[in-house]
């Protein structure tokens, strides 16, 4: 979640020193009184803020670290008002880091505790077990290996409260059960799962069965060996949030290997470059979504064993996909019989993993909270991070719920207004902040390409500034206010309290762009939080029960489905366009998954029916879920092609409440959003930052995505000097350098790219061959990667072709040409400069055309072609003339079988 700051936001729209209010712990932004945007100067032209406080010199040491922790104040003058607090937390961070280096060698070595604690083997094969339990009076290792005899394997305690024992090689069999038995100060004995255990297990199907630790030491031939290198860190992360257990189509718990084999290819096909895995750390209660962790070092045994998880991560790397772990260091399950919570005997804080009183308990989550100031707890948590990276190959982390860590009040019953006094004072949990600084410092120093993301609802300043500047060190934060505004708008519309005509473009832009300069955000329109039972996904808010009855393309969409399809695409696209420097989606939401997530529980008779993903809906071509899935693929590959998420040029030029228009520039792209339910704008003049020629590269209204096909995709739009003169929106501080005219249909969005102004080798070759007229033929690769990346071809001057352009709203493949095709007449507005379509010359093809064999025995008698309702009516144009008879879609659908061995080399 992000909060306003006094400095310019990355996107050039309203940024204010304060937010107006907070709803449910989430800051709601407002716009400055002037309504004018704050713009970001080019990096080379930036100057210090004109303030005596902001102009203070920031000193750095020879190691590049800030001398006093005030480097983060260089870009935020409000931080100087809290200089004392920031210097204090920096001093404490440096003190502990120096003490660790003195005692352990370095922070990185300190974080290798998993090689010393728990079960480890010496070079000679002996088994060494160590456990930190200073409150225990006596301890013994028990398990299958010694018949659970508490007198067989006693542990010895050192001066630091560490118990240990060394066993002969082979004394414990791989896969056998183990526990530690400890005597408490009151004389009682307890059996506990070792805190550093690598795997734990509970008998499936047995109600109330407790977990046992599992000694995991497979023989060499059973160990998984990595085959693929880590993918490089992408310019911007397109994150697919996934839960392995509920990722299958069948009503069961899916496995790590099934996810790797069946789901990862889907993620790759959609164009995501990162997968964020939930519920990997062992948790006793499946319905907790993985957030009530019992054993932080153990993999969730429901989905497989450690070698299976290594297979998954390596398979992702082989596909070029990075893997983030949803790590939970903000709290831990209270289940004393199942995990680390059992090591609390009521001892003093200095001898415990957990704090005392309110410092050690989160009443809303019913969870224990770590004692972040304790030396051994810091070792435990830092080593936990390094273990997942070193042992399994994870590429980063998403830190869950760190608001609970940042403040002594844990964010409970708090409304964060953006006032800096809420962030820097006695409410701040400085030891927890220092732990997060050490975690990020260790991770980024040890693994330069790692990515660490924070989930924080408070908007803590400096959260995503480097540790060397005095920041907390995260790479990005989740923009948690964005899904809230969509839920608020969609719920109000569904309940009849807000018309679409009354949506505020001003509020939408303010929320999506409300983030602190230089602190990156991951934008998302919805996540697992909106998918869980009791909440609703955007698709469910939009279409409700009609998602079950009105999604067949054999029938005309109802008004509810038509609206839902259009807005589902628009909400996701605008979130990605201006909502952050990265993007996240929860699995299934990309195609509007119609069912909520309800884990097996007593209330649903322990059913898995709603704890799975209906991939079959996205794969069925005659369902509208298939079209939404296609759009998500195209949206991901839009960034893959243009890298606009990582681009520094970000500018929202227009947010017009009267016309319901939002226009933004991001990198080389122009985004035009028309949220009006009925008004289509022809010859709409929009401001553009760079002069030149533009074309559409993505259209929510395209036929391929379940749209109405109201826009001609191959039209060329040329800019004119001077900004738009027809009107200036309330967000436009001044007209843009130039303008161009576009068609903006109701409830749709189009993305334009600037055609590079370089000498075209294809045109040069055509001119050399005596071709007087040149036309680009766009070969859509949408079926392969969804990005609409195009090859190009030139043709000699053809004989006169029928008037008009190619069909609007469709991308087609010139390798599959109907020689009898005559294009329909289209809307020829003055802004469209399209040459007639020439026939394709055979010399333009790299491969010969294949003949198509039609199987007349495979006919769908119920197939009826769809036709756009009231084509052209919304834009004021007349309906196009009917196409020639040879162009009319057959009233039956035939299966086309391509014979690759049947090639016609003379095809024309």
What is each PLM-predicted segment?
Residues 1-41:
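N-terminal chloroplast transit peptides
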Residues 50, 54-240, 256-271, 560-585, ...:
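Carbohydrate-interacting/catalytic domains
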Residues 239-250, 293-296, 360-373, 418-420, ...:
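Short glycine/proline-rich turn/loop motifs
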């Amino acid at each position: 979640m992000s909060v306003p700051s006094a400095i310019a936001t990355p996107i050039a729209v309203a940024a204010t020193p304060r937010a107006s209010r907070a709803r449910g712990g989430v800051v709601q932004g407002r716009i400055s009184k002037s309504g004018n945007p704050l713009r970001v100067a080019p990096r080379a032209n930036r100057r210090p803020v004109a303030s005596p406080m902001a102009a203070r010199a920031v000193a750095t040491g020879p190691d590049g670290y800030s001398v006093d922790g005030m480097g983060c104040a260089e870009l935020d003058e409000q931080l100087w008002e809290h200089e004392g607090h920031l210097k204090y937390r920096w001093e404490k961070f440096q003190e502990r880091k120096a003490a660790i280096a003195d005692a352990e060698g370095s922070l990185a070595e300190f974080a290798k505790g998993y090689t010393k604690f728990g079960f480890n083997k010496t070079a000679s094969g002996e088994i060494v077990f160590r456990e930190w339990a200073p409150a225990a009076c006596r301890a013994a290792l028990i398990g299958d290996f010694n018949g659970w005899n508490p007198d067989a394997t006693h542990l010895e305690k050192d001066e630091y409260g560490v118990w240990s024992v060394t066993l002969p090689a082979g004394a414990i069999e791989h896969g056998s059960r183990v526990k530690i038995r400890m005597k408490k100060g009151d004389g009682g004995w307890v059996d506990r799962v070792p805190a550093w255990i690598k795997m734990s297990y509970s008998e499936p199907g047995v109600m109330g069965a407790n977990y046992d630790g599992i000694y995991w030491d497979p023989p060499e031939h059973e160990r998984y060996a990595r085959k693929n290198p880590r993918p490089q860190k992408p310019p911007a992360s397109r994150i697919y949030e996934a839960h392995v257990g509920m990722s299958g189509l069948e009503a069961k718990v899916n496995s790590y290997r099934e996810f790797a084999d069946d789901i990862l290819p889907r993620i790759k096909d959609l164009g995501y470059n990162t997968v964020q895995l939930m519920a990997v750390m062992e948790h006793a209660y499946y319905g907790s979504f993985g957030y009530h962790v019992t054993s932080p070092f153990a993999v969730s045994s429901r989905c497989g064993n450690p070698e299976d998880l290594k297979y998954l991560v390596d398979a992702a790397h082989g596909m070029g996909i990075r893997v983030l772990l949803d790590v939970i260091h903000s709290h831990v399950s209270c289940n004393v019989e199942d995990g680390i919570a059992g090591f609390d005997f009521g001892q003093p804080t200095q001898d415990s993993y957990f704090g005392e009183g309110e410092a050690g308990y989160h009443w809303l989550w019913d969870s224990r909270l770590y004692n972040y100031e304790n030396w051994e707890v810091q070792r435990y948590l830092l080593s936990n991070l390094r273990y997942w990276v070193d042992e399994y190959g994870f590429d980063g982390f998403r830190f869950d719920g760190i608001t609970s860590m940042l403040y002594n009040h844990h964010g409970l019953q708090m409304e964060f207004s953006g006032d800096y006094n809420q962030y820097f004072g006695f409410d701040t949990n400085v030891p927890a902040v220092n732990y997060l600084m050490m975690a990020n410092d260790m991770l980024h120093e040890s693994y330069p390409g790692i990515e660490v993301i924070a989930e924080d609802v408070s908007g803590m300043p400096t959260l995503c500034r480097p540790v060397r500047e005095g920041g907390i060190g995260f790479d990005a934060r989740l923009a948690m206010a964005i899904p809230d505004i969509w839920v608020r708008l969609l719920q109000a519309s569904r309940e009849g309290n807000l018309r679409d005509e009354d949506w505020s473009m001003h509020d939408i832009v303010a929320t999506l762009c409300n983030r602190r300069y230089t602190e990156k955000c991951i934008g998302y329109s919805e996540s697992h939080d909106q998918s869980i039972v009791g909440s609703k996904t955007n698709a469910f808010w939009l279409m409700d029960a009609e998602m079950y009855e009105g999604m067949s393309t054999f029938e005309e969409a109802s008004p509810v489905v038509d609206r839902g399809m259009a807005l589902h695409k628009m909400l996701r696209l605008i979130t990605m366009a201006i909502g952050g420097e990265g993007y996240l989606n929860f699995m299934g939401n990309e195609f509007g998954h119609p069912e909520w997530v309800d884990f097996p529980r007593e209330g649903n008779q322990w059913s898995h029916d709603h704890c799975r993903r209906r991939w079959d809906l996205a794969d069925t071509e005659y369902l509208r879920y298939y079209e939404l899935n296609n759009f998500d693929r195209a949206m991901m590959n839009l960034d893959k092609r243009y890298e606009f998420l990582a681009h520094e040029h970000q500018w929202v030029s227009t947010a017009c409440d009267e016309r319901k228009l939002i226009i933004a520039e991001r990198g080389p792209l122009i985004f035009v959003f028309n949220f009006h339910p009925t008004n289509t704008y022809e010859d709409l003049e929009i401001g553009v930052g760079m002069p030149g020629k533009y074309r559409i590269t993505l259209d929510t209204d395209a036929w391929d995505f379940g749209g109405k096909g109201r826009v001609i995709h191959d039209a060329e739009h040329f800019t004119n000097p001077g900004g738009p003169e027809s009107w200036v929106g309330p967000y436009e501080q001044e007209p843009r350098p130039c303008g161009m005219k576009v068609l903006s249909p109701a409830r749709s969005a189009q993305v334009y790219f600037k055609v590079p102004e370089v000498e075209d080798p294809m045109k040069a070759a055509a001119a050399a061959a005596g071709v007087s007229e040149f036309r680009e033929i766009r070969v859509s690769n949408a079926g392969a990667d969804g990005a609409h990346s195009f090859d190009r071809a030139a043709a000699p001057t053809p004989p006169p072709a029928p008037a008009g352009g190619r069909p609007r709203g469709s991308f087609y493949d010139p390798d599959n040409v109907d020689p009898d095709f005559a294009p329909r007449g289209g809307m020829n507005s003055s802004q469209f400069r399209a040459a007639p379509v020439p026939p394709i010359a055979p010399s333009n093809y790299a491969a010969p055309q294949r003949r198509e064999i039609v199987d007349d025995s495979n006919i769908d008698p119920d197939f009826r072609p769809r036709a756009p309702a009231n084509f052209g009516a919304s834009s004021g144009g007349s309906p196009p003339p009917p196409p020639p008879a040879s162009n009319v879609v057959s009233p039956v659908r035939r299966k086309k079988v391509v014979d690759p061995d049947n090639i016609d080399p003379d095809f024309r």
